[in-house]
C-alpha cells in the first residue's frame, strides 16, 4: 500500500520495526481491539516504512478525518499482510488436510 504524506509517496511495510515502534508508543504488544490501536499501528507502520518521515500522530488523525477511507484501506492491507505472513510461516491449514465426511 502506498500513501502520500506531505507530498512524499511512502510504500507501507508491515515489519518487526513497525511492531517495536508500536510497543514503544503504546506500551503494549499489538492486539487490535479498537480504532485507537489500529490508528497507532498505522502510525507505527508509516514511521517504520519511512525513517525520515516527519509526521506527528495528530497529522495522521487529520489525514484520516479528511479521508476516512484511509483507515479502511489500511485495515484491508494489514489483514492481507498478516494472511500472507501466516501462509509463509505455515500457520494456515491446507484445505485438503481435513478429510470430507462421507
Which residues does each predicted region cover?
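Short, structural beta-strand-to-alpha-helix junction motif
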Residues: 14-26
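General structural signal for alpha-helix termini and helix-helix connectors
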Residues: 25-28, 48
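Short, hydrophobic/amphipathic alpha-helical patches that form generic packing surfaces
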Residues: 37-48
